[in-house]
Design a protein with these regions (language model features):
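OB-fold single-stranded nucleic acid-binding module
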Residues: 21-248
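Sec-dependent N-terminal signal peptides
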Residues: 4-19
């Protein structure tokens, strides 16, 4: 009887060990994540680069590893753990690969902290890739745009053009939601125009970048940094703006 119990125990331990190994094997490289079908389960290990505001036990995370980046939408997270999701922190994320208006992201995600040295991504200059299919390969990465020109944006029902808008249609204010409406501005590069956004839950109205965009003038030439979000085309979430040549 004791031998039978011992064999049962050994078998149970072996099953547990196999399950743990199988679970570890499900962690995908970024290439495997890219090749996974939309709506399929995914598990990745990556590093926090920035977060939006925590709310209702969720937080949206911009994450990146040496081999690629992820937009992790509404990560289930306590307020206590949210405070620990500082840039460089390594996490393992499990969720579903989803696509919305061209943006590929991880939905319904959960996470756990993983031991490891911190990693902070450097912004890659992708200015030359604007308007090319190659740009999408950098989706969600920390990127830079150099020497782009601010052009005017029109608002329906109003005369003139504006260097930026509070909300996509100009209907917002800097007081919305306590952090201000998202800021939208248009830049010209490589002979075409692109819409850039300051996502206020990422960089609110008290941040340097929000104030910098509020101070832009049509014709300013600027350098920008941010995360390459996608919405029916490139729509970067901008985290830094520097005017390099003021408008005349």
């Amino acid at each position: 009887m004791k031998k039978i119990l011992a064999l049962v125990l050994v078998f149970a331990l072996a099953v547990c060990a196999s399950a743990e190994l199988a679970e570890e094997a499900t962690v995908l490289t970024h290439e495997q994540y890219e090749n996974a079908e939309v709506d399929s389960p995914v598990c990745v290990e990556t590093y926090v680069q920035a977060t939006q505001s925590w709310w209702d036990n969720t937080i949206t995370v911009y994450a990146q590893s040496e081999d690629g980046a992820y937009f992790i939408y509404k990560l289930a997270c306590s307020e206590e753990d949210a405070a620990k999701l500082v840039p460089g922190t390594k996490i393992r994320v499990t969720g579903t690969k989803i696509e919305w208006s061209g943006e590929v992201e991880i939905g319904d995600p959960t996470f756990e902290f993983v031991d490891g040295d911190p990693f902070i991504a450097e912004a890659e200059d992708v200015t030359a890739l604007l308007g090319t299919d190659e740009l999408a390969k950098h989706m969600n990465e920390k990127v830079a745009f150099k020497g782009v020109k601010v052009v005017g944006t029109k608002v329906e029902g109003q005369d003139g053009e504006f260097p930026f808008l509070y909300s996509y249609d100009g209907s917002g204010t800097r007081e919305d939601n306590g952090v201000g409406a998202d800021l939208y501005f248009t830049v010209e590069a490589n002979g075409a125009q692109y819409s850039f956004t300051v996502e206020s839950y990422l960089c609110g109205n008290d941040t340097d970048v929000y104030k910098a965009v509020e101070g832009l003038k049509i014709g300013d030439v600027i350098d920008c940094e941010g995360f390459l979000y996608w919405y029916n085309g490139a729509n970067p979430h901008i985290t830094g703006v520097t005017v390099v040549t003021p408008a005349e």
